[in-house]
């Protein structure tokens, strides 16, 4: 009797939680289908007018990416530069009056007689400026700065009196060196007792150069450019490896293997060349230059050969320095405004 009673109790509890069935609901689509369709605002657009734009947008072209856009910009506008734009180089100065270095009217050739003496025209001191003076008074600021700094360093090291003695000795050695060269290159004279002179190291330094020099035409001879109004005293005019050159002998304590190490010496050489070619005292024409840097310790000298093209370039620079000097002199002589 216990089992039926328990079962009845369970049924009564389940009846409490039973859910009543909802009445059936019918979904009707008739009203939706029969209702009036709303008009789309885009249908009012003139589609034919924009058909080309639609086709271009919906075309099957490659998708644009940041990389492709950058490449396109590079093609259209060039690559993006992260550096500053380079400043335009200053235009090279050109002389106002381009006087030629060579004399087209001169056809005379140098004499080849070994017994004839080289020209030795003395320098006449007058109001015409010398090549050395012109170059000194138009020295570029950078070159002048380094020269002054060298002087200050030497004075600190040697003192005022010591530096004066040093420069005096350098000048004396250079003078003796040129005197010895004049003796070597003159047919009538010979160098004697070279080893007892201070310049013996310099002479040893240029031995390999002397073997290639012949046909000496002038030694320690004055030149004057009648048209450009300047004078000078050249060291030598002779043939070097078969080319007639104005030769400038220089001494140095430091090696100068490059022509730019000689500073204004090339301008000095071409100034003498132009003067020789237009000086009535000389019948020949010089087309090349040679700078020989000799060393006191006897180490091989450095020869710097200047061909016709290089001489023409330095000649243009010399004309600029000459114009600068002339302009400075005009400014100095001009009367001050009242």
From Swiss-Prot:
Family as reported in the entry's similarity comment: Belongs to the MGME1 family.
Transit peptide, residue positions per record: 1-64
Catalytic center residues: 235, 248, 250
UniProt keyword list: DNA damage, DNA repair, Exonuclease, Hydrolase, Mitochondrion, Nuclease, Transit peptide
EC numbers on record: 3.1.-.-
Source organism of the structure: Mus musculus
Role of this protein: Metal-dependent single-stranded DNA (ssDNA) exonuclease involved in mitochondrial genome maintenance. Has preference for 5'-3' exonuclease activity but is also capable of endonuclease activity on linear substrates. Necessary for maintenance of proper 7S DNA levels. Probably involved in mitochondrial DNA (mtDNA) repair, possibly via the processing of displaced DNA containing Okazaki fragments during RNA-primed DNA synthesis on the lagging strand or via processing of DNA flaps during long-patch base excision repair. Specifically binds 5-hydroxymethylcytosine (5hmC)-containing DNA in stem cells.
Intracellular or extracellular location(s): Mitochondrion
Keyword Magnesium: no
Protein name per UniProt: Mitochondrial genome maintenance exonuclease 1
GO biological process, one term: mitochondrial DNA replication
Gene expressing this chain: Mgme1
């Amino acid at each position: 009797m216990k089992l039926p009673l328990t079962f009845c109790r369970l049924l009564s509890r389940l009846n409490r939680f039973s859910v009543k069935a909802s009445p059936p609901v019918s979904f009707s689509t008739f009203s939706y289908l029969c209702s009036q369709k709303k008009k789309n605002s885009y249908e009012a657009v003139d589609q034919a007018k924009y058909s080309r734009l639609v086709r271009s947008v919906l075309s099957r072209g490659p998708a644009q990416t940041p990389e492709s856009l950058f490449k396109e910009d590079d093609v259209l506008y060039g690559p993006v530069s992260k550096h500053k734009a380079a400043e335009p180089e200053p235009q090279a100065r050109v002389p106002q009056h381009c006087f030629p270095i060579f004399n087209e009217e001169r056809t005379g050739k140098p004499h080849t007689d070994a017994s004839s003496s080289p020209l030795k025209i003395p320098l006449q001191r007058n109001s015409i400026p010398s090549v050395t003076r012109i170059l000194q008074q138009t020295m570029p600021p950078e070159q002048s700065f380094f020269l002054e700094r060298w002087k200050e360093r030497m004075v600190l090291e040697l003192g005022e009196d010591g530096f004066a003695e040093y420069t005096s000795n350098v000048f004396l050695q250079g003078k003796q060196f040129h005197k010895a060269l004049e003796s070597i290159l003159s047919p009538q004279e010979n160098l004697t007792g070279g080893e007892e002179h201070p310049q013996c190291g310099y002479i040893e330094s240029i031995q390999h150069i002397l073997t290639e020099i012949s046909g000496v035409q002038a030694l320690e001879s004055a030149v004057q450019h009648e048209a450009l109004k300047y004078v000078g005293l050249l060291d030598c005019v002779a043939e070097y490896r078969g080319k007639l050159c104005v030769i400038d002998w220089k001494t140095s304590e430091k090696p100068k293997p490059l022509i730019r190490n000689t500073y204004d010496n090339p301008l000095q050489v071409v100034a003498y060349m132009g003067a020789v070619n237009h000086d009535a005292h000389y019948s020949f024409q010089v087309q090349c230059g040679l700078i020989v840097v000799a060393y006191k310790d006897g180490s091989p000298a450095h020869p710097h050969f200047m061909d016709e093209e290089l001489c023409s370039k330095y000649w243009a620079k010399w004309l600029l320095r000459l114009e600068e000097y002339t302009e400075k002199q005009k400014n100095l002589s001009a009367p001050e405004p009242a």
